[in-house]
Swiss-Prot record:
Identification of the protein by name: Ras-related protein Rap-2c
Family of this protein: Belongs to the small GTPase superfamily. Ras family.
Annotated tissue distribution: Expressed in liver, skeletal muscle, prostate, uterus, rectum, stomach, and bladder and to a lower extent in brain, kidney, pancreas, and bone marrow. Expressed in mononuclear leukocytes and megakaryocytes.
EC number: 3.6.5.2
Covalently lipidated residues, kind S-geranylgeranyl cysteine: C180
Protein source organism: Homo sapiens
Pfam families, per the entry: Ras
Length: 183
């Protein structure tokens, strides 16, 4: 059984813990309690292949931002979460993705951009088109979720497994002869 380390990143109050706990336990956390760091494990079957996810739910507040490099260094897949009802949280996600690329030294890191709190549609500040455009720029999937109504939560974690599976496939080598002569 394959094991994957997934890191959930985003600003404070965007619903990182709510999404993670909803996925792992099937319950919604009503009360906001800022996270420093929480760790979860869950078995998941994606495309008939069993896997174990080790999910690191990180602090969203800036006072713990210095810990992010370590989380990123150890992570294999990343879920970047912003709140659909908070434009600033959408802006905050961009430097986090830049940090992932800097630490990993690789552009094609398994990553999903997530707009959370779709259940609060009347209060929306970030349009779906903005999320889609940013995901397209980054070359990653985009999803809108609701931890409260459990909308797209299981699909989100299944998709990050697919992304990690896809990135671990060996890249096709160029067709070339095995001997080269330089004169």
């Amino acid at each position: 059984m394959r094991e994957y380390k997934v890191v959930v990143l985003g600003s404070g109050g965007v619903g990182k813990s709510a999404l993670t706990v909803q996925f792992v336990t099937g319950t919604f956390i009503e009360k906001y309690d800022p996270t420093i760091e929480d760790f979860y494990r869950k078995e998941i079957e994606v495309d008939s292949s069993p896997s174990v996810l080790e999910i690191l739910d990180t602090a969203g507040t800036e006072q713990f931002a210095s810990m992010r490099d370590l989380y990123i260094k150890n992570g294999q897949g990343f879920i970047l979460v912003y709140s659909l009802v908070n434009q600033q949280s959408f802006q905050d996600i961009k430097p986090m993705r830049d940090q992932i690329v800097r630490v990993k030294r690789y552009e094609k890191v398994p990553l999903i951009l997530v707009g959370n709190k779709v259940d609060l549609e009347p209060e929306r500040e970030v349009m779906s088109s903005e999320g889609r455009a940013l995901a397209q720029e980054w070359g990653c999937p985009f999803m809108e979720t609701s931890a409260k109504s459990k909308s797209m939560v299981d699909e989100l974690f299944a998709e990050i497994v697919r992304q990690m599976n896809y990135s671990s496939l060996p890249e096709k080598q160029d067709q070339c002869c095995t001997t080269c002569v330089v004169q």
